[in-house]
A protein has these predicted regions:
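Short acidic/glycine-rich beta-turn/loop cap or linker motifs at sensory/regulatory domain boundaries
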Residues: 1-10
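Short loop/turn elements at sensory-signaling interfaces that couple input to output
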Residues: 82-98, 102-108
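Sensory-domain boundary/capping and coupling elements
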Residues: 107-119
Length: 119
């Protein structure tokens, strides 16, 4: 999506994001989000999540990490971890490439490893 605080237009989504959001195709994703990345984030978390992302980037990092509840096309929410990387694209200018991971899946597949990290 565009790395612009005022215009976070979604430019591309892979099949995994379509699956996580419950969308059949890119057009459906763009329609329910209004083409905006922030509209994937639960409304009461949007401001704090955006502030966190930009604070990390403005602090000199090219990667950002955040946790939020992602709104699916059916109106339900899932807990996700977001790992974004800001880059300069020849065709689209400054953009974020983002990997969004379902927290429950991570816990199910890596639970033991995650517990070891905490010790």
């Amino acid at each position: 999506y565009r790395a612009d605080k005022e215009n976070d237009e979604i430019l591309l989504a892979n099949n995994e994001l379509l699956r996580l959001t419950g969308c059949k195709n890119m057009d459906e994703l763009l329609a329910y989000t209004g083409k905006s990345f922030r509209n994937l984030i639960r409304r009461d978390e949007q401001e704090s999540c955006q502030k966190s992302i930009w604070s990390q980037i403005d602090g000199g990092n090219v990667n950002d990490y955040s946790f939020f509840h992602m709104r699916k096309a059916d109106g339900t929410y899932i807990s996700v971890l977001d790992h974004g990387r800001i880059v300069d694209s020849v065709h689209n200018g400054r953009v974020f490439y983002v990997m969004i991971m379902d927290l429950k899946s991570l816990q199910r597949h890596y639970g033991d490893c995650l517990e070891l990290v905490e010790k």
